């Protein structure tokens, strides 16, 4: 739908996510490559992606919706909630929960990777998207994957 809107010249809101770390709110746009820590963020995302593949977990390229809307590079590291979550992990203390607010719906690919990250780092990650509240803990989401099953 968003692709068709762009093709028809309609304005499409960019995906944006916000995370608070140490009292400061940080904003990330989809495909944000201008953040001062973007190399560190992308490096950690790449490590998570490799661990997912090794563990046989459904990775970012598996989501049909994402394949239609973005290149593999965008799918892998361009979604704003992934950037915000990893920024939060890098810049907060061990065991601290991560809270992210996103202006759009969280895609299946992001949902899968955040479940994996929450289990891998043993941290609670909460994401409020345009549709619902997701609380990830130990690789399980409070939404019980409703709407994300294949």
Model-flagged regions — what are they?
Residues 1-150:
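Terminal (and in a subset, N-terminal) low-complexity or junction segments at the ends
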């Amino acid at each position: 739908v968003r692709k068709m809107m762009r093709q028809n010249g309609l304005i499409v809101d960019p995906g944006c996510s916000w995370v608070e770390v140490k009292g400061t709110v940080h904003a990330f746009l989809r495909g944000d490559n201008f953040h001062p820590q973007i190399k560190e963020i992308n490096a950690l995302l790449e490590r998570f992606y490799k661990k997912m593949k090794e563990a046989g977990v459904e990775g970012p390229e598996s989501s049909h919706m994402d394949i239609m809307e973005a290149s593999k590079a965008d799918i892998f590291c361009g979604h704003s909630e992934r950037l915000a979550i990893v920024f939060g992990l890098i810049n907060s203390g061990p065991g601290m929960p991560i809270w992210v607010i996103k202006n759009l719906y969280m895609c299946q690919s992001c949902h899968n990777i955040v479940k994996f990250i929450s289990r891998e780092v043993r941290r609670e990650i909460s994401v409020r998207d345009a549709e619902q509240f997701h609380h990830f803990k130990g690789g399980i989401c409070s939404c019980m994957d409703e709407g994300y099953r294949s």
